Amino acid sequence: MSEYLFTSESVSEGHPDKVADQVSDAILDAILAQDPKARVAAETLVNTGLCVLAGEITTTAQVDYIKVARETIKRIGYNSSELGFDANGCAVGVYYDQQSPDIAQGVNEGEGIDLNQGAGDQGLMFGYACDETPTLMPFAIYYSHRLMQRQSELRKDGLLPWLRPDAKAQLTVVYDSESGKVKRIDTVVLSTQHDPEIGYEELKNAVIEQIIKPVLPSELLTDETKYLINPTGRFVIGGPQGDCGLTGRKIIVDTYGGAAPHGGGAFSGKDPSKVDRSAAYACRYVAKNIVAAGLATQCQIQVSYAIGVAEPTSISIDTFGTGKISEEKLITLVREHFDLRPKGIVQMLDLLRPIYSKSAAYGHFGREEPEFTWERTDKAAALRAAAGL
């Protein structure tokens, strides 16, 4: 029987790029709490002893950006110089400009050539869903995120007090080529930052028994499964001290772990007038409802936009041979049941709220918290009825 391998990875909230993402989204949320119509493109850089805030912000909100950055870094767990990065001691620089008026006139409703609220930029976005997990996410990315959440829980609860904030997980999964179903887990890679005193064997055993095995389905862990735990043997220096972190550098971790294409636009720090974020969320919403409706077991949607223009320049769908109706019919249903203009997306998903901080770690999709409105399947019944199933 033929089979193939597929791999996805996740990183913890203490990974330097994720620190940057979380600072950017915390600043976005602080602004939206006061000014829901603000235009925000907040970028963050973190390095040893340094946090730089830059980008374009147009708002009436009064926000202490330095305080928000420090509080976010502290919440993640970088609160001591022993960790190489200290929320209270690092230097924080603020270098925000305002949004270009040339861009603003294309986005502001009633201005520019298209009087509707136009897209904030050109670009292409993808959404994806499949039936491999309860949240209709691909297996490898879903469980990679769960491993990282487990690492964080054990660190913060003090059950494994030698854990430090920075960590990464990677799963290689074996699929059956004929059915396309997951057969077993081939390799688990988990690297976690740790205190210098902990011995390697104690660390390895604790990671396998207390992080990995409680999370991964036991029936998919076999005698052939390989465990690669801190493969270099030591991971004391980590976080922004180990590597410079930047907003928007973990776009595959943020989405589908490579199981679906990515249009290239990052999410964190961007208000929902930026279709890089809002349209990608809408695409996930569409794809998930199609799968939840039983119209396909796998669904990928692409949309594209032109700056200043409200209507998408294209919509395409691929169900990889699993569709119960044609892809042309699915596109018609999508146009009938989902408003994919920027203003329509914002209203449909209620995006002008301070809801983004949670999304900046452990994935933007496959989440069940109430803030993640794009994970609802409230359109599934209507889609199924309209399809005649």
Swiss-Prot record:
Primary localization class, coarse: cytoplasm
GO molecular function, one term: magnesium ion binding
Entry keywords, A to Z: ATP-binding, Cytoplasm, Magnesium, Metal-binding, Nucleotide-binding, One-carbon metabolism, Potassium, Transferase
Pathway involvement of the protein, from the record: Amino-acid biosynthesis; S-adenosyl-L-methionine biosynthesis; S-adenosyl-L-methionine from L-methionine: step 1/1
Alphabetized PROSITE patterns for the sequence: ADOMET_SYNTHASE_1, ADOMET_SYNTHASE_2
Flexible loop, as annotated region: 99-109
Region forming the signal peptide: none
The reaction(s) this protein catalyses: L-methionine + ATP + H2O = S-adenosyl-L-methionine + phosphate + diphosphate
Cofactor note: Binds 2 divalent ions per subunit.
Top EC class, one word: transferase
Cellular compartments annotated: Cytoplasm
Keyword Cytoplasm: yes
Protein name: S-adenosylmethionine synthase
Organism: Neisseria meningitidis serogroup C / serotype 2a (strain ATCC 700532 / DSM 15464 / FAM18)
